[in-house]
Amino acid sequence: MSDLRLKRRSFLETLLAIPVGLLAGQQKVQPSGVGVKVAAGVDRFNDVRKLPGGDLVFVKVATQDTAGAFFLTEQPISRKWAGPPKHFHYEQDEWFYCLAGEYVIEVGNQRFELAPGDSVLGPRRVPHAFAFTGNTMGKLLVGFTPAGKMEEFFRELEKRGRYFGEGTGADKERARQYYGIENVGPPLSP
């Protein structure tokens, strides 16, 4: 009986050690614990980033600032704009907060009109799209949690000069597989 207990104990210790060993290799980098100020009208890294169509996007909270928990952009816009194709994220919730101007945002089959101070959450795996509908300057905060590869996605968007949904089937597949974004429809009309 004692030999059986010893074998069972050894088996259980080995079994319990497996998840600990797997998790040890997946530890995320801890945030620095240092506050980061990003001034109005500038990017976290002092970069000038542009969305397709020429509008600016400023990184306000970088992926590295939160060890991957959150990524935040500020997107000022000066013209009516249809926004990105209707899409969803496999792993990220997307949050929109209107600082200035008027926007329309669709989440699933719901349509929301945003004015300054309003916000909308687009849960992961739920199709969403947004458009700037105002007649003056607009400014929208767009956040992602967890951050995933969204910061990298914005860098690639700038290099490409167009959204993945406007490209070939291979472009759409790359967006889906690498960034976890699937385009499911056209942009909204402003």
Model-predicted regions and their roles:
Residues 1-19:
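N-terminal secretory signal peptides and thylakoid transit peptides that target proteins
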Residues 25-56, 159:
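C-terminal segment of N-terminal export signals and the immediately downstream linker at the start
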Residues 49-86, 92-93:
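A short glycine-rich, His/Asp/Glu-containing loop-to-beta-strand
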Residues 84-86, 107-112:
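Short beta-strand segments
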Residues 93-103:
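Glycine- and acidic-residue-biased ligand/ion/polar-headgroup-sensing regions
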Residues 110-124:
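Short acidic-glycine-tyrosine-enriched beta hairpin
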Residues 124-151:
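Ligand-binding loop in jelly-roll beta-barrel domains
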Residues 156-190:
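Acidic/histidine-enriched, glycine/proline-rich intrinsically disordered or flexible terminal extensions
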